[in-house]
Amino acid sequence: MNFETVIGLEVHVELNTNSKIFSPTSAHFGNEQNTNTNVIDWSFPGVLPVLNKGVVDAGIKAALALNMDIHQHMHFDRKNYFYPDNPKAYQISQFDEPIGYNGWIEVQLEDGTTKKIGIERAHLEEDAGKNTHGTDGFSYVDLNRQGVPLIEIVSEADMRSPEEAYAYLTALKEVIQYTGISDVKMEEGSMRVDANISLRPYGQEEFGTKTELKNLNSFSNVRKGLEYEVQRQAKILRSGGVIRQETRRYDEASKSTILMRVKEGAADYRYFPEPDLPLFEISDEWIEEMRTELPEFPKDRRARYVAELGLSDYDANQLTATKVTSDFFEAAVALGGDAKQVSNWLQGEVAQFLNAEGKTLEEIQLTPENLVEMIAIIEDGTISSKIAKKVFVHLAKNGGGAREYVEKAGLVQISDPEVLIPIIHQVFADNEAAIADFKSGKRNADKAFTGFLMKATKGQANPQVALKLLAQELAKLKED
């Protein structure tokens, strides 16, 4: 029997506001433990939460970007549970009226086709703290993360393969990143994914029993975990077994999913309206104000790059994969840079440098201005493409002007025949054996002189001019 895969994803995104959702404490990641806290985060008696308007702004932007309807009658709810990293013993979240609902996002699959994935809801809530278990036998609680604003985006169970889940996450990350409401860095926990997967016989409308997957710390692991679950569940069902409702985690070492706990039933969080936060309305004017702050999204940029700039679909996809790269490209083209040349540099030397250095485009000194200037001095013959790679590394590490550096470093390409011809004659004098080979008609003997000349000029000879002059001077030798 063959089975249809059914997947839904729950994605928690940390919003990049300066302060937390209900307290004025910094929401910055990476500080020493328990330094980004105050009496609200510790839930001291008598303290009251105050809603950060910037969090609602971000929620509205996310809802609009994901084609969602917006609940304009806003309130928060208490989700009751006890855990050491949750000092209040409840989480302030949204239950029956999330900020966004009934949305969708279009994703591009590997075969080039597109699919629309439904989004059930997006709700605002506070993050919990973090537990760590020490080697000394003690467990520690860090409340820096307590109260950091989250938006949880819950998809419909519309994905029918791990590939579609991967494509959905890629598209979702792009859209959220472009809105500017989060950096969506999984390695820092600002984007976290839980996956629900079940199988059912083809043609059956009722969903099968689902398994929840956790510990998915990369899109690649989401895909691998789901692929493993498809095989595991299919094997059980084909052997006549029954799928239990479980929570499992993906283990990178064994490339398998491992049981965490069996779910006997749905958790009862005893939701009720948050009494310490007032009800409020999201006005039409507020929504429209947030709409005006939305950027051009990746899909639209890709189409424009192909139609107006003449780039290939591949190049357009690569350039828009991150907003930082796309914005850099936009700025360079606006300065007069050739779109194809800028694209080639960003996908080639720049990408290789970033990978080697373990840095992002924002962390190096390259700017649209000095990249465009460097491309211009390649085009006008001031430097060769080979020397340009050296110039680029300098610009990436130190910044500054491309032309200024080239002139100071003595890297200007030699194109003047009056300078090159004497060097060619010296090359001939220094390589008598090669001259003899050439005069005797030895095959490809003339090609050796190109290398000799480039070595003599430390790579600064203009290749086109140098080859033409070499051919001219070698022809004279032959006549002699």
From Swiss-Prot:
The UniProt entry's GO biological process terms, in alphabetical order, are:
glutaminyl-tRNAGln biosynthesis via transamidation; translation
Q: Which gene encodes it?
A: gatB
One Pfam family recorded for the sequence = GatB_Yqey
Query: Which top EC class applies here?
Result: ligase
Family, according to the entry, reads as follows:
Belongs to the GatB/GatE family. GatB subfamily.
E.C. code: 6.3.5.-
Lineage per the UniProt record: Bacteria, Bacillati, Bacillota, Bacilli, Lactobacillales
Disulfide bond sites: none
InterPro entries to which the protein is assigned, alphabetical:
Asn/Gln-tRNA_amidoTrfase_suB/E (IPR017959), Asn/Gln-tRNA_Trfase_suB/E_cat (IPR006075), Asn/Gln_amidotransferase (IPR018027), Asn/Gln_tRNA_amidoTrase-B-like (IPR003789), GatB (IPR004413), GatB_C_1 (IPR042114), GatB_Yqey_C_2 (IPR023168), Gln-tRNA_amidoTrfase_suB_CS (IPR017958)
Q: What is this protein called?
A: Aspartyl/glutamyl-tRNA(Asn/Gln) amidotransferase subunit B
Q: Its Gene Ontology molecular function terms?
A: asparaginyl-tRNA synthase (glutamine-hydrolyzing) activity; ATP binding; glutaminyl-tRNA synthase (glutamine-hydrolyzing) activity
Keyword annotations: ATP-binding, Ligase, Nucleotide-binding, Protein biosynthesis
